[in-house]
From Swiss-Prot:
Hemolysin-type calcium-binding repeats lie at residues 721-738, 739-756, 757-774, 775-792, 793-810, 811-828, 829-846. It comes from Aggregatibacter actinomycetemcomitans (Actinobacillus actinomycetemcomitans). This is Leukotoxin. SUPFAM superfamilies: beta-Roll (SSF51120). Residues 993-1006 have a biased composition (Low complexity). Its main location: membrane. Changing residue 687 to R: Loss of cytotoxicity. Residues 795-815, 990-1009 are annotated as: Disordered. Residues 334-340, 502-506 are annotated as: Cholesterol recognition/amino acid consensus (CRAC) region. PROSITE patterns: HEMOLYSIN_CALCIUM. Keywords: Calcium, Cell outer membrane, Coiled coil, Cytolysis, Hemolysis, Membrane, Repeat, Secreted, Toxin, Virulence.
Length: 1055
C-alpha cells in the first residue's frame, strides 16, 4: 500500500494535491474485491439513454443547449413528430418525471429536465443568454453526462432492454415493479443531492473527481472513464475552493435556523432535518426492496415491510451529528470570545473560530452524504439478509457506497488543508501590512485586556506597600488559543512561549505610555536584566505571575510520523538575573514569583541566580526560590523569606566582617518551588497532528538523595525574616535582627545587642553576648537571655524563659509559663495563665495583676525581693499558710503561692528543686559552672539566702514586709490565715494616715513606692541598650519593634 505524507509547510502543499488520488486508492482497496465479484455476476448490458422532446415544446437557447450537449455525449435525441410518434411514456407510470422508461429505453424528458435546470439559477442564467450559448452547452453537457454516468452505474445489474421488450409483448414480468421502484429511487437521489448542493456544476465536478479516482484503480477503468469524459472539469489536484463551497452549501441546512440553539437542540434538529431530507429516499428504498420481494413471489405486507423501513431509519443516527454540533458551538464561542480582543487589534480568535466553522461544514457535509449512503446500504443489507434481493445487488450497493465514502474521507483532508492555508494567507497579509509578528500581537492584546481590568489591583499594591509607584512585570504565558492557531496554520516555529510586560503605575493614575518602549528600558528577558535606576520616588517591583527564566527561544519543525509533526523548542538560557534598584528612594522588591529553576528533558535542574544591587535608601526584599545575592546598600534593609517556596534556612553571620553580612543555605528538598518545564500542545488539522513545545512552569517538589540547596549572600542587611519551615539563625558579632516567622526555629544571637523574634511555632532563642531582646511569639517557646541585660517576652503559649547573668526583664505572656531570672536583679512578669517564677540570685521584682492566673514564686536568694500587685489594693488580699507555703488570695481565689516561705535553707539537702531546674534548662556550656556554684553554697546558711519575698506593694504604694507577715502568724502560734482587716490595721499603724482609703499617703508609702519605681527604672535602663533606636521599613509585616518600649512605659506608669 502506498504511503502518503501530508504537508506541514506551504512548500509541500503542491505535492500534497497530487497525492490525494493515491490516498483515495487506500480507502477504495477495502471494497475492491467485493465490487469486482458483483460486476462479474451482473454482466454487461446494452442500455442506452434518450432525450425525449415532445411535439410543440417551446424552443430557445435552453432547448438548443440541451440538444447539442446530448449530441456531444452520444445521447439519442428524439423529437416527437419529426423522428416518430409520441413515445409511450406511461410504461411503469414513469412519465412526467425527470427520468422514465419508454419503448426506446431510459428516457430523459426534456420539459422536466429543462425545468430542473431552470430551477438552478447559476446554471439557468447562463443557459438563457444567447451570448453564453457555448458556455451553456458545456454546462448542460456536464449535467447530462453526470446523469448518464449515474444511470449507467445504477442500472448496471439490470437488463432494461429485455425488460422493455417483454413488457411491450404483454408478458407479465414481475421485474416490472422492480424497475419502477429503481427509477423512483434514482429520481429521489438526484433530486435530493441537487437540492442540497444547489449547484449542478459542482455536483458534476464531484462525480468527475470520483470517476478520475476510480480510473486509476485496476478493474474500474470502464466505470471511471464514463465519469472522466465529462468536459472541462479539470483534474483532481484543483478545485478545492469549489469543493469547500459545495460543503458550505450542504452544511447550511445542518446549521439550522436557530443560531442560538444549544448543542443538544442542534443535534436533535439535525436528526429531524436528516429524516426530512432522507424521508423520500427511505421510502423509495423501502419500495425498491418490497418490489424485489414481490418479484420473488413473497409476501409484501405486515412485519417484513416494517422491518425493512426500521433498518433504514436506524442507519440515520443523530449521534453522527453531535460532534459536528460541538464544533459549531466552539466556533460560536470563539467568535464571542474574540470581541474582547478585536478592539486591541487582534483577530486570531475569530480566525480560529472560522477554522472550526469551515471544517465543521466539511464534516457536516460528509456526514450527511455518508448518512445517505449508510441508509441505502442498510436497507439493501436488510433485504439481502432476508433473501429479498440477490447477493449481486447487495454486493454492488455495499461496494459502491464504500467507494464513495472512502473518496469523501480522502478529500476531507484536502479541504482541511485548504481552509488552513486560507487562514495562513490572512496572517501573512496582516504581517506584511503592519510589520509585526501576528502571534506576538495576540499576546499584546491579551495583556491590554488584563491592564483594563487591573488598575484596582495596582492601587491595592501601592496601598499595601506604601510606595508612590508600582512597577509590575507581568508574564503573559503560553496561550492555548494562540498556540492552536499557530499549529493549524503551520506557524508553530514562529510563536514564542509568551511575552513579558512592564507596567508602571504612578500615584494610582498613570500607566506608562508607549509600553513596548518602556518595557525595553526596564526589562531585557533575553539577557536577564531588570533596571530601575531611572525610576524616581519610592517604588514597589512585583511580578504578578511567574516570570520565565531569561534566555532566547529557538524552534524547529520536523516530521515524526506519517501524519505527525513536532515543533521542538531549544532555549539558550542565562545563568543570572541582574537587578538594579531604585537609587535614591525606598524600594520594595518581591522576587517570590521569579522562576529560578528550569528542568531539562533529562530531568536535570538548572538554576538562574538572582543578583540584586539596591539603592541607598530603605529596601525590603522578598526572596524567591533560587540562589540570591542581595547588595542592599545604605539605609535600613530587610530580607524576607516568609512568602514560602524558599526551603528551610540556615542563616549564618558568625564569620561576618561587616555588619549586615550573612551567608544563607536553603534546603529545597521536599519543598514546592516554581520550576520551568517544557510542555506540549497538540493541534489537529484533520488527520494531521502538530505537537508544539513551549515553556511552562509548575509548582512542584524536589526529591533528591543528596538534597537540593540554594545559597544566598546578604550584604548590608539589617533585618532578616525567616521561612515557614524550621530555620536556624546564627548571629554575628554585630547587632542582629532575626524573625523566625513560622516553623519551630532555632535562633542564636551571639555577640552584639540583638533583637530576636521566634514568631509562630515552638522556637528556641538564645541571646548570647550583649543586651538582647527576645520575643517568643505564638507557640511554646524556650528563651535564654544568657549574657548581658536582656528583655525576654514569651508571648502566647506555654513558654520557658531564663534570664542569664545580667539584670533581665522576663514576661511570660499568655499561657502557663516558667520564668527563671538566674543571676542579677531581674523583673519577672508571668502574665496571664498559671505560671512558675523563680528570680534566682539578686534582688528581684515580681509583677502580678488581678487578671492573671495562679502564679507560683520560688525565691532562694536576695534580701530585697519585691512583689508588685500592679492593680490590686492590699486591703483586698488575705494570706493563708499551707504547710511551708504561703498563699496570697484575692477575691476568694489563690493568686500567688510562695514556695517554701516557712522553711529554712538546708545545707545538707543538696541541690534543691529550683537549682535542679536551673541545671536542667541551662545551656550545656553553663551547667558545670552553675553546679560548682550551687555546691559552694552547700554547708553554710547565709542570712541573705531565704525563701521569701521581702516586700509586697499594693497598687497605691501600700506595703507589707515578709517580717510583718511572719509576725502576724507567729503571734497566734498555729495561726493559718491573715485577714484583710488585720492587714489594714498593720498598714495603718505603719503610716500616719488614718485609713488606706485616705486621699493622702503616708511618707512611708510614698517612699516605698518611689523605691519600687527606682528599682524598675534601673532594670529597664539596664535592658534598654538596644531596640529603641532600631527601625524597620514601614512595609514590614512584623511590627514588633516597640514591644519593649510599650512595656517599659507600662511598668513606669505602674510604679
Amino acid at each position: 500500500m502506498a504511503t502518503t505524507t501530508l504537508p506541514n509547510t506551504k512548500q509541500q502543499a503542491a505535492q500534497f494535491a497530487n497525492s490525494v488520488a493515491d490516498r483515495a486508492k487506500e480507502n477504495i482497496d477495502a471494497a475492491k474485491e467485493q465490487l469486482q465479484k458483483a460486476l462479474d455476476k451482473l454482466g454487461k448490458t446494452g442500455k442506452k439513454l434518450t432525450l425525449y422532446i415532445p411535439k410543440n415544446y417551446k424552443k430557445g437557447n435552453g432547448l438548443t443547449a440541451l440538444i447539442k450537449a446530448a449530441q456531444k455525449l452520444g445521447i439519442e435525441v428524439y423529437h416527437e413528430g419529426k423522428d416518430g410518434p409520441a413515445l409511450t411514456n406511461g410504461i411503469l407510470n414513469t412519465g412526467k418525471k425527470l427520468l422514465g422508461l419508454t419503448e426506446r429505453g431510459l428516457t430523459l424528458f426534456a420539459p422536466e429536465l429543462d425545468k430542473w435546470i431552470q430551477g438552478n439559477k447559476h446554471l439557468s442564467n447562463s443557459v438563457g443568454s444567447t451570448g453564453n450559448l457555448t458556455k451553456a452547452i458545456d454546462k448542460v453537457q456536464s449535467v447530462l453526462g453526470t446523469l448518464q454516468a449515474f444511470l449507467n452505474t445504477a442500472f448496471s445489474g439490470m437488463d432494461l432492454d429485455a425488460l422493455i421488450k417483454a413488457r411491450q409483448n404483454g408478458k407479465n414480468v414481475t421485474d416490472v415493479q422492480l424497475a419502477k421502484a429503481s427509477l423512483n429511487l434514482i429520481n429521489e437521489l438526484i433530486g435530493t443531492i441537487s437540492s442540497i448542493t444547489n449547484n449542478v456544476d459542482t455536483f458534476s465536478k464531484q462525480l468527475n473527481k470520483l470517476g478520475e479516482a476510480l480510473g486509476q484503480v485496476k478493474h474500474f477503468g470502464s466505470f471511471g472513464d464514463k465519469l472522466k469524459n465529462l468536459p472541462k472539469l479539470g483534474n483532481l489536484g484543483k478545485g478545492l475552493g469549489a469543493l469547500s463551497g459545495v460543503l458550505s452549501a450542504i452544511s447550511a441546512a445542518l446549521l439550522l435556523a436557530n443560531k442560538d440553539a444549544d448543542t443538544a437542540t442542534k443535534a436533535a434538529a439535525a436528526a429531524e432535518l436528516t429524516n426530512k431530507v432522507l424521508g423520500n429516499i427511505g421510502k423509495a428504498i423501502t419500495q425498491y426492496l418490497i418490489a424485489q420481494r414481490a418479484a420473488a413471489g413473497l409476501s409484501t405486507t405486515g412485519p417484513v415491510a416494517g422491518l425493512i423501513a426500521s433498518v433504514v431509519s436506524l442507519a440515520i443516527s443523530p449521534l453522527s451529528f453531535l460532534g459536528i454540533a460541538k464544533q459549531f458551538d466552539r466556533a460560536r464561542m470563539l467568535e464571542e470570545y474574540s470581541k474582547r480582543f478585536k478592539k486591541f487589534g487582534y483577530n486570531g480568535d475569530s480566525l480560529l473560530g472560522q477554522f472550526y466553522k469551515n471544517t465543521g461544514i466539511a464534516d457536516a457535509a460528509i456526514t450527511t452524504i455518508n448518512t445517505v449512503l449508510s441508509a441505502i446500504a442498510a436497507g439493501v443489507g436488510a433485504a439481502s439478509a432476508g433473501s429479498l434481493v440477490g447477493a449481486p445487488i447487495g454486493l454492488l450497493v455495499s461496494a459502491i457506497t464504500s467507494l464513495i465514502s472512502g473518496i469523501l474521507d480522502a478529500s476531507k483532508q484536502a479541504v482541511f488543508e485548504h481552509i488552513a492555508n486560507q487562514l495562513a494567507d490572512k496572517i501573512k497579509a496582516w504581517e506584511n501590512k503592519y510589520g509585526k509578528n501576528y502571534f506576538e500581537n495576540g499576546y499584546d492584546a491579551r495583556h491590554s485586556a488584563f491592564l483594563e481590568d487591573s488598575l484596582k489591583l495596582f492601587n491595592e499594591l501601592r496601598e499595601k506597600y506604601k510606595t508612590e509607584n508600582i512597577l509590575s512585570i507581568t508574564q503573559q504565558g503560553w496561550d492555548q488559543r494562540i498556540g492552536e492557531l499557530a499549529g493549524i496554520t503551520r506557524n508553530g516555529d514562529r510563536i514564542q512561549s509568551g511575552k513579558a510586560y512592564v507596567d508602571y503605575l504612578k500615584k494610582g493614575e498613570e500607566l506608562a505610555k508607549h509600553s513596548d518602549k518602556f518595557t525595553k528600558q526596564i526589562l531585557d528577558p533575553i539577557k536577564g536584566n531588570i533596571d530601575l535606576s531611572g525610576i524616581k520616588g519610592s517604588t514597589t517591583l512585583t511580578f504578578l505571575n511567574p516570570l520565565l527564566t531569561a534566555g532566547k527561544e529557538e524552534r524547529k519543525t520536523r516530521q515524526s510520523g506519517k501524519y505527525e509533526f513536532i515543533t521542538e523548542l531549544k532555549v539558550k538560557g542565562r545563568t543570572d538575573w541582574k537587578v538594579k534598584g531604585v537609587p535614591n528612594s525606598n524600594g520594595v522588591y518581591d522576587f517570590s514569583n521569579l522562576i529560578q529553576h528550569a528542568v531539562t528533558r533529562d530531568n536535570k535542574v538548572l538554576e538562574a541566580r538572582l543578583i540584586a544591587n539596591l539603592g541607598a535608601k530603605d529596601d525590603y526584599v522578598f526572596v524567591g526560590s533560587g540562589s540570591t545575592i542581595v547588595n542592599a546598600g545604605d539605609g535600613y534593609d530587610v530580607v524576607d523569606y516568609s512568602k514560602g517556596r524558599t526551603g528551610a534556612l540556615t542563616i549564618d553571620g558568625r564569620n561576618a566582617t561587616k555588619a549586615g553580612q550573612y551567608k544563607v543555605e536553603r534546603d529545597l528538598s521536599g519543598t514546592q518551588v516554581l520550576q520551568e518545564t517544557v510542555s506540549k500542545q497538540e493541534t489537529k488539522r484533520g488527520k494531521v497532528t502538530d505537537l508544539l513545545e513551549y515553556r511552562n512552569y509548575k509548582l512542584d517538589y524536589y526529591y533528591t538523595n543528596k538534597g537540593f540547596k540554594a545559597h544566598d549572600e546578604l550584604n548590608s542587611v539589617e533585618e532578616i525574616i525567616g521561612s515557614t519551615l524550621r530555620d536556624k539563625f546564627y548571629g554575628s558579632k554585630f547587632n542582629d535582627v532575626f524573625h523566625g516567622h513560622d516553623g519551630d526555629d532555632l535562633i542564636y544571637g551571639y555577640d552584639g545587642d540583638d533583637r530576636l523574634y521566634g514568631d509562630n511555632g515552638n522556637d528556641e532563642i538564645h541571646g548570647g553576648q550583649g543586651n538582647d531582646k527576645l520575643y517568643g511569639g505564638a507557640g511554646n517557646d524556650r528563651l535564654f537571655g544568657e549574657y548581658g541585660n536582656n528583655y525576654l517576652d514569651g508571648g502566647e503559649g506555654d513558654d520557658h524563659l531564663e534570664g542569664g547573668n545580667g539584670s533581665d526583664i522576663l514576661r511570660g505572656g499568655s499561657g502557663n509559663d516558667k520564668l527563671f531570672g538566674n543571676q542579677g536583679d531581674d523583673l519577672l512578669d508571668g502574665g496571664e495563665g498559671d505560671d512558675q517564677l523563680a528570680g534566682g540570685e539578686g534582688n528581684d521584682i515580681y509583677v502580678y495583676r488581678k487578671e492573671y492566673g495562679h502564679h507560683t514564686i520560688t525565691e532562694h536568694s536576695g534580701d530585697k525581693d519585691k512583689l508588685s500587685l500592679a492593680n490590686i489594693n492590699l486591703k483586698d488580699v488575705s494570706f493563708e499558710r499551707n504547710g511551708n507555703d504561703l498563699l496570697l488570695k484575692t477575691n476568694n481565689r489563690t493568686a500567688v503561692t510562695f514556695k517554701g516561705w516557712f522553711s529554712k535553707p538546708n545545707s545538707s539537702a543538696g541541690l534543691d528543686e529550683y537549682q535542679r531546674k536551673l541545671l536542667e534548662y541551662a545551656p550545656e556550656k553553663d551547667r558545670a559552672r552553675l553546679k560548682r556554684q550551687f555546691e559552694l553554697q552547700r554547708g553554710k546558711v547565709d542570712k541573705s539566702l531565704n525563701n521569701k519575698v521581702e516586700e509586697i506593694i499594693g497598687k497605691d504604694g501600700e506595703r507589707i514586709t515578709s517580717q510583718d507577715i511572719d509576725n502576724l502568724f507567729d503571734k497566734s502560734g498555729n495561726k493559718k490565715t491573715i485577714s484583710p482587716q488585720e492587714l489594714a490595721g498593720l498598714i495603718k499603724n505603719k503610716g500616719k494616715s488614718s485609713s488606706l482609703m485616705s486621699s493622702s499617703r503616708s511618707s512611708s508609702m510614698l517612699t516605698q513606692k518611689s523605691g519600687l519605681s527606682n528599682d524598675i527604672s534601673r532594670i529597664i535602663s539596664a535592658t534598654s541598650g538596644f531596640g529603641s533606636s532600631g527601625k524597620a521599613l514601614s512595609a514590614s509585616p512584623l511590627q514588633t519593634n516597640n514591644n519593649f518600649n510599650s512595656y517599659a512605659n507600662s511598668l513606669a506608669t505602674t510604679a
